[in-house]
Amino acid sequence: MRTGRVTPGLAAGLLLLLLRSFGLVEPSESSGNDPFTIVHENTGKCIQPLSDWVVAQDCSGTNNMLWKWVSQHRLFHLESQKCLGLDITKATDNLRMFSCDSTVMLWWKCEHHSLYTAAQYRLALKDGYAVANTNTSDVWKKGGSEENLCAQPYHEIYTRDGNSYGRPCEFPFLIGETWYHDCIHDEDHSGPWCATTLSYEYDQKWGICLLPESGCEGNWEKNEQIGSCYQFNNQEILSWKEAYVSCQNQGADLLSIHSAAELAYITGKEDIARLVWLGLNQLYSARGWEWSDFRPLKFLNWDPGTPVAPVIGGSSCARMDTESGLWQSVSCESQQPYVCKKPLNNTLELPDVWTYTDTHCHVGWLPNNGFCYLLANESSSWDAAHLKCKAFGADLISMHSLADVEVVVTKLHNGDVKKEIWTGLKNTNSPALFQWSDGTEVTLTYWNENEPSVPFNKTPNCVSYLGKLGQWKVQSCEKKLRYVCKKKGEITKDAESDKLCPPDEGWKRHGETCYKIYEKEAPFGTNCNLTITSRFEQEFLNYMMKNYDKSLRKYFWTGLRDPDSRGEYSWAVAQGVKQAVTFSNWNFLEPASPGGCVAMSTGKTLGKWEVKNCRSFRALSICKKVSEPQEPEEAAPKPDDPCPEGWHTFPSSLSCYKVFHIERIVRKRNWEEAERFCQALGAHLPSFSRREEIKDFVHLLKDQFSGQRWLWIGLNKRSPDLQGSWQWSDRTPVSAVMMEPEFQQDFDIRDCAAIKVLDVPWRRVWHLYEDKDYAYWKPFACDAKLEWVCQIPKGSTPQMPDWYNPERTGIHGPPVIIEGSEYWFVADPHLNYEEAVLYCASNHSFLATITSFTGLKAIKNKLANISGEEQKWWVKTSENPIDRYFLGSRRRLWHHFPMTFGDECLHMSAKTWLVDLSKRADCNAKLPFICERYNVSSLEKYSPDPAAKVQCTEKWIPFQNKCFLKVNSGPVTFSQASGICHSYGGTLPSVLSRGEQDFIISLLPEMEASLWIGLRWTAYERINRWTDNRELTYSNFHPLLVGRRLSIPTNFFDDESHFHCALILNLKKSPLTGTWNFTSCSERHSLSLCQKYSETEDGQPWENTSKTVKYLNNLYKIISKPLTWHGALKECMKEKMRLVSITDPYQQAFLAVQATLRNSSFWIGLSSQDDELNFGWSDGKRLQFSNWAGSNEQLDDCVILDTDGFWKTADCDDNQPGAICYYPGNETEEEVRALDTAKCPSPVQSTPWIPFQNSCYNFMITNNRHKTVTPEEVQSTCEKLHSKAHSLSIRNEEENTFVVEQLLYFNYIASWVMLGITYENNSLMWFDKTALSYTHWRTGRPTVKNGKFLAGLSTDGFWDIQSFNVIEETLHFYQHSISACKIEMVDYEDKHNGTLPQFIPYKDGVYSVIQKKVTWYEALNACSQSGGELASVHNPNGKLFLEDIVNRDGFPLWVGLSSHDGSESSFEWSDGRAFDYVPWQSLQSPGDCVVLYPKGIWRREKCLSVKDGAICYKPTKDKKLIFHVKSSKCPVAKRDGPQWVQYGGHCYASDQVLHSFSEAKQVCQELDHSATVVTIADENENKFVSRLMRENYNITMRVWLGLSQHSLDQSWSWLDGLDVTFVKWENKTKDGDGKCSILIASNETWRKVHCSRGYARAVCKIPLSPDYTGIAILFAVLCLLGLISLAIWFLLQRSHIRWTGFSSVRYEHGTNEDEVMLPSFHD
């Protein structure tokens, strides 16, 4: 569309220039995916992470300050590989760096220059730290620019090949421990690739990145003859816009086809996909079909069945069937493969088509730039017109650029072509190829809406133009129209040819206007104020700017500004005139902010408008002089013009509006459908020029319905020509800030806008940002299904298509729609209660009843708007009140709506409604009132069309009086699913009989696990009708739901969640496939089936019964003649088939349908050979599925499929009406497992027994399961089924997995299978008295002390145990469990003879198991208290012995192995024995202590983690007692503290605890202030300390030494200051880098270690104290002698005994008298 006359080569090159004018097309360096710094405007600092906090530092370009936008609006920091996030669960310190897969809030969006996330937290800077605050105005910018952080949004990078079907990259993605934020290269992939999900290692989803490439290498195929390169994305399935963006991101475009040769090349590709997108679209409002690369649309190959002139619901994108080469219009949101295309030759110089050239023509001809034009006054056919032009030496007009179109529209027709005019464009080919009659090349096409519409296989086709834009239309060449002739004129060489413009240099003429560029950059308005009024004028200005600025990026001021900073832009006064805004040409994401002035850009976005700062920004100017008076503007509608009936307005509006909401329409629609709906009425979706209009518009709408609504408006950017800018669908220019910056994200795909309308008054309680939430719009994907509003100018009359049902407003104005009912508010006359009831009845309605919170809220709001706050209005009491929650206050909820007054009268007002509805009123009071009609009148005539009801057409499948349609919508809510079915002219399925149930089941294969059916009700009402209004006469709810206490969560503010809706379950092989579940209607489930009714009943699913019919993998044939069972066998053999075996619910349902429709029973291949004890299939298949009738009074040996679909026994010699034969195809059932050796019983009326290995299983749902069923009752039931059956036991992991598989067939409605575990003799065992040799408890060893518990196997394979302590939990367990019985066909051999013995002798020790949850240290202590040790292993036999203990116990157990420096080489046994045997092959798990798991798995765990027990052993031989000397010269031991022992001149003490080095020093100081960590002076002391540790061993042989290395001189020294005169380093650490040291007591060597790592024993050392004991004894003896002497003297004085003195006695102090013997143990 952008060229004049160019050659084919130049036309091909034109593509690149046009693409380069797109902001979306540039290579990745300008795509917005590049890293940047984040600058705080006030401080100029940049933020960066520091230990997961975010701090502000001086800016630099280093990696530690670089950030990047990545997928899902996350900010990724390059160096830390983390994302900026907010943990809203924390009140403070909530902003941090998180892993990019964290569940905290990681998304960020921009609002002007601020950055915000969830709950309106904004990024702020406080005291040098980045914080999140709800009250901040901090401004953030990209480093090196004035742009906000979202100025260049993140662009998706799409993929090909791989296994992601073209989905875009997910950045960052995780591989190993590295997060990648860009595509990566490696040898395993053919090009740069990325993951398409967050974790590549988990999902393994990937694709080759589609990045810009120069030339046609790599993914591209070159065709030099055509001059283009092609990229065939055959496995990549995208929507049209996604495919378009994928091509654009590579500097290419979607496929366009311009000749039969190119069509043949594309369709001739052998490996091309069957259907591929074309770039053909009509996404630009008010324009026709065009190529997305803007090449002329002159070649066409439409499919004959494609409506290129869409009616309501039409499509605006095109695809090609590559087998036929035909083009089809399809929904732009459908998913197709695609082909990208780009030109080979990228060089192009466009011809000058805009320079004014003075031209001379004959009288009556219009001169313009070298050509002469003549508009004929007469009408002729195209051929006659062509001949007449030839007679003038001219030809019919050809147009090659917008400059030519402008001449036609503005000069020939004065701005409006009111009647069609012939052009010289004509097609005589099939496929169509349009050519100019003058032989010039077609370089421009300018099609009108829905054009070119070429009749199939009918030529010739000719082209006319019409309308204000002069757009083109295909017409019959015989039609008589006026025409324009064109010929070359005489170019005048006169220098005064531009005399219309001022004589100054630089003025350029365009039409009757002159323009000049002022080359000095200046602020806004310095030179002049340029106005731009049309697309033609914009194109001319682009030409001027491009010629002026061919290399630099300059800006040129326009006169557009927002003087009041309201976000509303208008032209400044120019030449004394202020013009209205009639045209806009914004760049993408513009207008970005209010209060600015608008400049035009150059370069790759030539001519696009951008908002700039009026004062600080400097740009060039273009001044404009108009030589002739401006034409008066067309008469606009007046505010007081009337609106049509049923349309609404507000005083300041020039438009009328009509709302199409879900209560009044058949279905919600996507944006295109809604716009075409409005166009069919002569209207458009709404447009706005001022923000005040929006508020008034929302105020107008919010009283017309209840609840929150999203409504389509006309704002969109669907067309590639818009280059990412917004436009209104009615061509109203965009003159205001229409989209908040926060909603400009995802601009590549979200191309249509909707406005939110909701009620305000009730929201103040819980909404903090009411003004923002009150009414705003945001972009949606255009395929979203929403309600909409149509807009028509005031004074206009809407069109009335046949399908439209115009609204009758009524005498009291338009109704308000609330929850599916119409309400009229009758303000006059005032009547009493009974009169009001009669008045409503006379108008086919009722006095309004309030039954819900939503209804109350909506009515209250309406009353507040139309009457005084205290004005009372009559309402009616509810006859069947619905129990609903609603908000009574901020503190409490009212659980019962108080509408239960019977015949009493009620009124309410907007202010006192709560009091009003709680008391009776005076029934005779005269009041206004509210009438209600329950069935809303639809604005669309939706009742199934009689013609459509005759038969089921196209993809609809007939059954009886219904048609069923398979659809695949993905997960949707119930209301969305219902709307989708409405869009097909149907409803969700209603299941009215067993026959319909079977038919639906037969359609279920390949569908999702759960799908909606048309049943909806509340928890407080009885289910009695389907959504198609049919009575509920049949139900098939899953038996597990019977009697179950139901708990479906509801969202208080989501009305839909208060309703329950039904699902049909697709459980694959399960016999319960087809049963119904129910859930909240707001949940999302699959929609797979819709239905509609047909007047003709289809009674035969296949017409000819002699014909074989395929269903799934089998061929079936019905023999319709009387047969015995054996006769049926022979008949099937004659057909080389078998009597049918039914092995799954789908086959059963399919065949049951045949029996139902024919009302005939049929023999099937099931019979008994042992007098009805067991039944089997005649072809030897396993009986794994059954459908026995509930009662079968008489048992016989053969089986029929009866007319009700159930199996019943019959006498084999009876004649039945027929039989079903089949030929099995590829078997769908799994092959019988090799280990399934058991032959299971198969009695009548029993669920089939399922074989696995040597056992048979029966999974049951008991009839009274909602009542308590004890394990004993389950055991009794099993014994009744079979004498050898018992309740379920599980012997190994394979059996556990098998049972889980069976449980999952219940689709999580059942959560457990009950296990047959009982409690006897203080231990758990199976009901058959065998031991639990295999267990899989969820929480480890259960703590059970009695038999009051239930055990069950869960859907995740773990075993759960539930005690009877909590009644609710026990009942929940009962109601969500199924029972299972088991027959072990081979007697189970209990290898261990029951439970594990308490003591187990082995070699020189006795072993026992601590059977309780303990840490490693607790286990060590428990073993020690019983006089033993944790077990150790020293040879393979010992390893097998311990592993056997663990296997028999069934739980992971601690052993005595630990490491205290974190390395495997330092493992030690806690009993002090040598680590001389390694019992594992590898031990990679973290942790310092070792657990032995069942199956012989040795694993490292954290020593403080809790395990299910430990293995202890106690040696049979006692340890040898060793004594050490305790000296009085050593300190006295503190209470419970270690004893001091003497060696040489020092005392030594050690506790039984492990310490770090710093702790060891502290411990010694606490024992005695002069004690230090042990120092060693010689070999003897070294041996003493080592022996002391071995004899008092505990956990480890590592002992801290008080020897450390100085950092300065690297010398070693003892902590007590002594010189280092003796060392004994082990060889392997002699040159180690540790600065501390330990003694290894086992080999008496020293090792260098790091001071801060590991743990060891602490030995403290202190010098001997002086010996004061002898002195004390002597002093005590002397005192005693003194006392004795005094006593003797006293006695002598009393008895006068004579003193003779003491005998001579000598006392000698014993050398060892102060020594005691302390016991110790020796190995």
From Swiss-Prot:
Question: What are the entry keywords?
Answer: Disulfide bond, Endocytosis, Glycoprotein, Lectin, Membrane, Phosphoprotein, Receptor, Repeat, Signal, Transmembrane, Transmembrane helix
Q: Might you report a single GO cellular component term?
A: external side of plasma membrane
Q: Residues in domain C-type lectin?
A: 225-341, 368-486, 493-625, 652-791, 959-1092, 1111-1223, 1252-1375, 1402-1514, 1543-1662
Q: Which residues form the signal peptide?
A: 1-27
Q: Where does the UniProt annotation locate this protein?
A: Membrane
> What does its PTM field state?
N-glycosylated.
* GO molecular function (one): carbohydrate binding
Source organism, top-level taxon: Eukaryota
Domain spans labelled Ricin B-type lectin:
33-182
Q: How does it sit in the membrane?
A: Single-pass type I membrane protein
Summarizing the function annotation, the protein's role is: Acts as an endocytic receptor to direct captured antigens from the extracellular space to a specialized antigen-processing compartment. Causes reduced proliferation of B lymphocytes.
Q: What protein am I looking at?
A: Lymphocyte antigen 75
Q: To which species is this protein native?
A: Mus musculus
Lineage start: Eukaryota, Metazoa, Chordata, Craniata, Vertebrata
